[in-house]
Amino acid sequence: FKPSEVINYGTAGAIKKGLTGIVECTKFYQRDMDVRSLLDLKLGETPFDNINEIINSDDGYLCGSGDSFVNKQIEMKVDLVDMEAYALAKVCILEGIKFRCFKYISDNADSDASSDWIENCKKGAELFQIKIKDF
């Protein structure tokens, strides 16, 4: 089985001020890969990997994926942060599958992020159920 398209929905923390609601991400970066002190690579670049950024379109938002919950300002210049979109987008590129990504802005990636996330998950799911009817 190979799907023709993968649609990812999840929550994200806003880095860009004023970002709210459900947004579509079209550019994906690995925000916590950092070997700059060891190799001549940029933040987000993985050694021996030729895919370091994924750009599906110039429209949409920049998403930085990582393994940690963000509760303070980060160094990478992205609009929002999550924990899975980069990996999903990369698998889709490698397998030749169309990828779309929608994120509900659940928090502002600050010190209140974890409590805001819990409160906003249900609201985001309800809004995405409405949005998916437009596909």
Ranges and model annotations:
Residues 1-135:
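Glycine-rich phosphate- or other oxyanion-binding loops that anchor nucleotides, phosphorylated ligands
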